[in-house]
Amino acid sequence: DVELIKTKIGYMSQKFSLHDDLTISENLNFYGGIYGLSSKQIKNKMNQLLNQLELENEKNNLVKSLPLGWKQKLSFSISIFHDPKIVFLDEPTGGVDPITRREFWELIYAAATRGTTVFVTTHYMDEAEYCDRVCIMVDGKIEALNTPGQLRQTFNASSMDQVFYTLARNAKRSELT
């Protein structure tokens, strides 16, 4: 049942799904409605989220006026607005400064602590260090799957960058014909 699945899964695309021509609160109302939340649930969740993100004074501003980091944090918060069991994040921290990246990961940790399973795709190997388990793909194939610590140990590496470099360097590239 598609409607049941929608209640269990969240998704944040690399290109934001926020509507730039709507205000922050209008976006929250819109997505809350899509997720099937009642008006009361939307209002309660909106107040909680605006407080958490420190956006109470910005709620009537158009999304297009927000800095990139705020848009990313808002987009993530909307993807878990309905308390899904699983959320998929596609390159969630691309293009933001290191402080905003760290703040974003704090939001991810908070969601995981509340029981949401979080899948993250990233090209930042330092972010892989923040994960409980890491799957490294090279040329579209899974080359490694384990905890960051176990992967570093297996590949005798001091960082996830070194693990990835070793895997990518040793990959058998298919030739173009």
Predicted regions and their residues:
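Helical segment within the ABC ATPase nucleotide-binding domain
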Residues: 102-114
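Catalytic Walker B motif of ABC-type/P-loop ATPase nucleotide-binding domains
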Residues: 87-91
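Conserved ABC ATPase signature
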Residues: 62-69
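ABC ATPase "signature
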Residues: 145-146
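Conserved ABC ATPase "signature" region
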Residues: 29, 33, 40-58
